[in-house]
Curated annotation (Swiss-Prot):
Origin superkingdom: Eukaryota
Organism from which the protein derives: Rattus norvegicus
Modified residues (Phosphotyrosine): 437
Single Gene Ontology BP annotation: lipid transport
Annotated protein name in UniProt: Vigilin
Alphabetical UniProt keywords: Acetylation, Cholesterol metabolism, Cytoplasm, HDL, Lipid metabolism, Lipid transport, Nucleus, Phosphoprotein, Repeat, RNA-binding, Steroid metabolism, Sterol metabolism, Transport
Gene3D superfamilies: K Homology domain, type 1
Single GO MF descriptor: mRNA binding
Spans annotated as Disordered: 910-946, 1214-1268
PTM sites of type N6-acetyllysine: 991
């Protein structure tokens, strides 16, 4: 069942009544406007007379009287004493020390109170506590608990009094503890003990004990009494509306608790003072005994549905009967099926009570009205407005609508229910006559499409046909749709819904298979591209799968033809995407990546734009050399060629083509490219490029430094020859830590095996999954021999031995510094051998080695070599001016790191000299003599190198000398190149971009002299190896710039054409389209005269460019002028009311006409003298045809305009004949400026007529303070 609550208009009427005074005021104002204007005195009443002012001044200006209550201070101070014998901390020599000070500080921080302590002569402690009352009380309690010795006592009080000591939520107990500064412990309710324990100071215990006993004594005076009274007599004791029991409670001061009717208990509880309680009990017993004797009962049957009317709201009807007749009415509980009502009272009053019970029972009636459930909401009306009319007239009638049932239930006073029933029946009859409903079956899968986005479709149908359409929710899976409303509207809505459903049934759904990687591209950023497709095919619904589903099915749904068109369009789009997703990888040496990128990405950006490809370079910190190019195949190939050409130009890169049969390519590449990768690594990292599989090409391209390319070519041809004759492969396994040892230093060991057996041995690359696998390839006998040798080596490595060697302790540090870097390198190189040096602090020289026998022997040999190097180590000084140090180091010290690796030496640069200028101060004297250092300085040769220039090299003598030569070779050299001064600024480039590019490309520093010097030389500083390349590059740039200068001179040829200014807009074209095409086609610049410049001839058009191109552009312009001169212009009178329709939305219609007839049509601007004059320009025959066409359109559109205007006459509201009179403004009568009286104007100098404000007056002696 569902009830409909209806808002009545009573409360609204009350609220609205507040508006009435405003309406009255408005009416008054309006009447005043119509009557005479007010007088000046009425509008501006005069100020009060002087006497009135003086009168008020007579009173005391607010004295502070005794009526004012003193404001209670928010901060209080309390002082209390702790005797010596009760102090916790007595053995303190000085106040403020030890535990006592800490405790005081803690209490102040926790409570916010301020504490001051002092010692009396008798060594007692005085404590002054200041702060807010609550904080002081808490601080006092803490001080007593922590600074004063604690005693305890027990107080026995009756168990039933304990709850009064605790109080509500324990508040009473907390207050008591704060007030007495004690801790009071009360036994738990389940503990039979009645002892209350108090802990604190003696004084506090006494106070707390007294308070507890006082509470108990108070409770001793009170008593509790329970009186058994039959439940039937409770109403007589309580009295009507509980008045009788209330009077007894008030008179005796006793609390009387009568159980409510719903609780099946008979005892009445009395609480209060013993004497008064006894009086109350006696009075109630008397009432009970009296009623028991005098009363009798009768039982009557009343329908269960009428019981609630007998009870009344909140039991008021029962109380009313009891008050009038003195009879109690007992109603059976609502969950009981009994209909018997018992009346209890004096016999003579039972008849009257019975009459009233039947009157109450029959005063209300329940009725029902038959109404189809679909009409219920129409009966209720929008926001309950229809029902509100009924309930407003009969507020006591309750109307209830039951969902799913064809009836309305009315409940209330009989007369009101009858009236309401008639009204509702009338409404139902009216609705049935003028409304209809229909139910249609449409497959539920189409329901959401019928509803439309955000309910657009269904809302349109509802509004258009004034019907209600009820579509079941998706969860019901029901096909039934119900339409309710006007019969005609219902039929029309039904027809449209069925048509929509039919159309959906005839729709075609097609699944397109599109790779998921293209979905995001088709959708576009923020859905831009898919929006364009949907705009192109608005009737087709395109659904992409959820990215998480990893599905490739894109669903299209809509009319068959549109779906087919959309399918073709999307397939073409996907084909373009596939074509544009062709990808090739180009291996480029890592050091040339920055040159391919160019300064600020200029080179790579240019290649991308010109080839229309996507180019991805590996990250700077990545070891990959591969550049990936994505786009159309032809474009990718072009981009690859350009990138390779850059690499070829930058370095001594050779490129060789080798012909190897295509059938051998896969076997040469090997599993996951392992074989070909091993050849590339062995030959200095050359790049070997095989043709695309299936192309049929035999050409293999090898690219890299010349010597490495030749080596790789020989190996590749040898391997191909082997593959052609016979190929045999064997896999063996070895622990990855053995691989470096098997390969040997610089690949020496493995090369020895290869040379002796002729087999090819391939070790796994770092990215391979199987790191244990070693592959041997070659002829069978060679492979078997190599396998035997390698397995013998691996077997030896598996035999772990432990050996030791003696190493001088002074060399130990070299091996263990930098977290054992040297030891780690030895372990990696020699099969994971473990080398253990003795702990620091011990004088042992024994070093233990553990691992494979061969690895241990090789590691011992290597350690011995290192020791020999350390013992043979020398230090060499290399003098290089400090200003070159940064250049010698290279970016991030890369050049120095390379030298230290190549020559196995250590290089130390000096600290930077902070004050390079030598001091000229006199030398310091000590004890009358010059300092020794000063004398040495004097003896130093002034030509010797400075300390800050000396670089120290440590290592073997021959290696140090080689490293010194390498360092000196890194010192930059400067050369000068002749460059004409006028080209300097072009070499520098915009914001220095040109010169920076050259410096980065050639790794040199280029210095261009200041412009004021007008020098013709440019200085280049850098390594000798780079200077020649840099000089050649600079001279090439000079040649380019000189060629550009010559080209600029040729391009600056100017030609003028004389053209009538009226033709200029046509030559320019819409948005400059025509002139832009001429400019691009002939590669010229065309300048039109400035309209605002009066000195410039307006018929001259200037063309700038190559002489040949300017002449061609001139001919193109003159050709357009020739065509324009043949054109004619005609004015046509065209009714201005149809102009907008001929022009169309955003000018679409007029553009279509102009394109169709090849004419120009100009409409008059707003405010033109003749708004109907339209100008048509073009070739004579085209103009005539265009005029005929627009005149036909005018005739057609005018008929619509006339009909529309005739209709508007009836739609307009009646015009007011009389216009409003102009507003008078604010008018007053008898104003001073309009007065004709002979009254004189006030004398401005008179202090009486114009008194002075702000003058001081002698103050009157009054009690101080404001008036209350």
């Amino acid at each position: 069942m569902s009830s409909v609550a209806v808002l009545t208009q009573e409360s609204f009427a009350e609220h609205r009544s507040g508006l009435v005074p405003q309406q009255i005021i408005v009416a008054t104002l309006n009447s005043e406007e119509e009557s005479d204007p007010p007088t000046y005195k009425d509008a501006f009443p005069p100020l009060p007379e002087k006497a009135a002012c003086l009168e008020s001044a007579q009173e005391p200006a607010g004295a502070w009287s005794n009526k004012i209550r003193p404001i209670k201070a928010s901060v209080i101070t309390q002082v209390f004493h702790v005797p010596l014998e009760e102090r916790k901390y007595k053995d303190m020599n000085q106040f403020g020390e030890g535990e006592q000070a800490k405790i005081c500080l803690e209490i102040m921080q926790r409570t916010g109170a301020h504490l001051e302590l002092s010692l009396a002569k008798d060594q007692g402690l005085s404590i002054m506590v200041s702060g807010k009352l609550d904080a002081v009380m808490k601080a006092r309690k803490d001080i007593v608990a922590r600074l004063q010795t604690q005693a305890s006592a027990t107080v026995p009080i009756p168990k039933e009094h304990h709850r009064f000591v605790i109080g509500k939520n324990g508040e009473k107990l907390q207050d008591l503890e704060l007030k007495t500064a004690t801790k009071i412990q009360i036994p738990r309710p389940d503990d039979p003990s009645n002892q209350i324990k108090i802990t604190g100071t003696k004084e506090g215990i006494e106070k707390a004990r007294h308070e507890v006993l006082l509470i108990s004594a108070e409770q001793d005076k009170r008593a509790v009494k329970r009186l058994e009274v039959e439940k039937a007599f409770h109403p007589f004791i309580a009295g009507p509306y509980n008045r009788l029991v209330g009077e007894i409670m008030q008179e005796t001061g006793t609390r009387i608790n009568i159980p409510p009717p719903s609780v099946n208990r008979t005892e009445i509880v009395f609480t209060g003072e013993k004497e008064q309680l006894a009086q109350a009990v006696a009075r109630i017993k008397k009432i009970y005994e009296e009623k028991k004797k005098k009363t009798t009962t009768i039982a009557v049957e009343v329908k269960k549905s009428q019981h609630k009317y007998v009870i009344g709201p909140k039991g008021n009807s029962l109380q009313e009967i009891l008050e009038r007749t003195g009879v109690s009415v007992e109603i059976p509980p609502s969950d009981s099926i009994s209909e018997t009502v018992i009346l209890r009272g004096e016999p003579e009053k039972l008849g009257q009570a019975l009459t009233e019970v039947y009157a109450k029972a029959n005063s209300f009636t329940v009725s029902s009205v038959s109404a189809p459930s679909w009409l219920h909401r129409f009966i209720i009306g929008k926001k309950g407005q229809n029902l509100a009319k009924i309930t407003h007239q009969m507020p006591k009638v309750h109307i209830e609508f039951t969902e799913g049932e064809d009836k309305i239930t009315l409940e209330g006073p009989t007369e009101d229910v009858n009236v309401a029933q008639e009204q509702i029946e009338g409404m139902v009859k009216d609705l049935i006559n003028r409304m209809d409903y229909v139910e249609i079956n449409i497959d539920h899968k189409f329901h959401r499409h019928l509803i439309g986005k955000s309910g657009a479709n269904i809302n349109r149908i509802k509004d258009q046909y004034k019907v209600s359409v009820r579509i079941p929710p998706d969860s019901e899976k029901s096909n039934l749709i119900r339409i309710e409303g006007d019969p005609q509207g219902v039929q029309q809505a039904k027809r449209e819904l069925l048509e929509l459903a039919s159309r959906m049934e005839n729709e075609r759904t097609k699944d397109l298979i599109i790779e998921q990687r293209f979905h995001r591209t088709i959708i576009g950023q923020k859905g831009e591209r898919i929006r364009e497709i949907r705009d192109k095919f608005p009737e087709v619904i395109i659904n992409f799968p959820d990215p998480a589903q990893k599905s490739e099915i894109v669903q299209l749904r809509g009319p068959k033809n549109e779906v087919e068109k959309c399918t073709k369009y999307m397939q073409k789009m996907v084909a373009d995407l596939v074509e544009n997703s062709y990808s090739i990888s180009v291996p480029i040496f890592k050091q040339f990546h920055k040159n391919i990128i160019g300064k600020g990405g200029a080179n790579i950006k240019k290649i991308r734009e010109e080839s229309n490809t996507k180019i991805d370079l590996p990250a700077e910190n990545s070891n990959s050399e591969t550049i990936v190019i994505t786009g159309k195949r032809a474009n990718c190939e072009a981009a690859r060629s350009r990138i390779l050409s850059i690499q070829k130009d930058l370095a001594n890169i050779a490129e060789v083509e080798v012909s190897i049969p295509a059938k051998l390519h896969n076997s040469l590449i090997g599993t996951k490219g392992r074989l070909i990768r091993s050849i590339m690594e062995e030959c200095g990292g050359v790049h070997i490029h095989f043709p695309v599989e299936g192309s049929g090409s035999d050409t293999v391209v090898i690219r890299g430094p010349s010597s490495d390319v030749e080596k790789a070519k020989k190996q590749l041809l040898h391997l191909a020859e082997e593959k052609q004759t016979k190929s045999f492969t064997v896999d063996i396994r070895a622990k990855p830590e053995y691989h470096k040892f098997l390969i040997g230093k610089g690949g020496g060991k493995i090369r020895k095996v290869r040379d002796s057996t002729g087999a090819r041995i391939i070790f796994p690359a770092a990215e391979d999954k199987d790191q244990d696998l070693i592959t041997i390839i070659g002829k069978e006998d060679a492979v078997r021999e190599a396998q035997k040798e390698l397995e013998a080596l691996i077997q030896n490595l598996d035999n772990v031995v432990e050996d030791y060697m003696l190493v001088d302790p002074r060399h130990h540090r070299h091996f263990v510094i930098r977290r054992g870097q040297v030891l780690r390198e030895i372990a990696e190189e020699y099969g994971g051998v473990m080398v253990s040096f003795p702990r620091s602090g011990t004088q042992s020289d024994k070093v233990t080695l553990k691992g494979a026998k061969d690895c241990v022997e090789a590691a011992k040999k290597r350690i011995q070599e290192i020791i020999e190097d350390l013992e043979a180590q020398v230090t060499l000084e290399c003098a290089i001016p400090q200003k070159f140090h940064r250049s010698v180091m290279g970016p991030k010290g890369s050049r120095i790191q390379q030298i230290t690796r190549d020559y196995n030496v250590q290089i130390k640069f000096p600290d930077r000299e902070e004050n390079p200028v030598h001091s000229v101060e006199p030398s310091i004297q000590e004890n009358g003599d010059e300092a020794g250092e000063g004398r040495e300085a004097k003896e130093t040769d002034p030509g010797s190198p400075r300390r800050c220039d000396i670089i120290v090299i440590s290592g073997r003598k021959e290696k140090c000398e080689a490293a010194k030569e390498a360092l000196e070779a890194l010192v930059p050299v400067t050369i000068e190149v002749e460059v004409p001064f006028d080209l300097h600024r072009y070499i520098i480039g915009q914001k220095g971009s040109g010169i920076r590019k050259m410096m980065d490309e050639f790794e040199v520093n280029i210095h261009v002299p200041a412009p004021e010097l007008q020098s013709h030389t440019i200085a280049i500083t850098g390594l000798a190896a780079n200077l020649d390349r840099a000089k050649a590059g600079l001279l090439d740039r000079v040649k380019e710039l000189q060629a550009e200068q010559e080209d600029r001179a040729l391009r600056s040829f100017k030609l003028s054409v004389t053209v009538d200014p009226k033709y200029h807009p046509k030559i320019i074209g819409g948005k400059g389209a025509v002139i832009t095409q001429i400019r691009l086609e002939h590669d010229v610049n065309i300048q039109f005269p400035d309209k605002d410049d009066g000195n410039q001839p307006q018929d001259q058009i200037t063309i700038t460019g190559y002489e040949k191109n300017t002449e061609a552009a001139r001919d193109a312009i003159l050709k357009i002028v020739g065509e324009l001169e043949q054109m004619v212009s005609e004015d046509v009178p065209l009714d201005h009311r149809v102009h907008a329709r001929i022009i169309g939305a955003r000018g679409k219609a007029i553009r279509k006409i102009m394109d169709e007839f090849k004419v120009d049509i100009r409409f008059p601007q707003s405010g033109a003298p003749d708004p109907n004059c339209v100008t048509v320009t073009g070739l004579p025959e085209n103009v005539e045809e265009a005029i005929d066409h627009i005149l036909n359109l005018e005739e057609e559109y005018l008929a619509d305009v006339v009909d529309s205007e005739a209709l508007q006459v009836y739609m307009k509201p009646p015009a007011h004949e009389e216009s409003k009179a102009p507003s008078k403004g604010f008018v007053v009568r008898d104003a001073p400026w309009t007065s004709n009286s002979s009254e004189k104007a006030p004398d401005m100098s008179s202090s009486e007529e114009i008194p002075t404000f702000g003058a001081q007056v002698a103050p009157k002696t009054l009690p101080w303070g404001p008036k209350r």
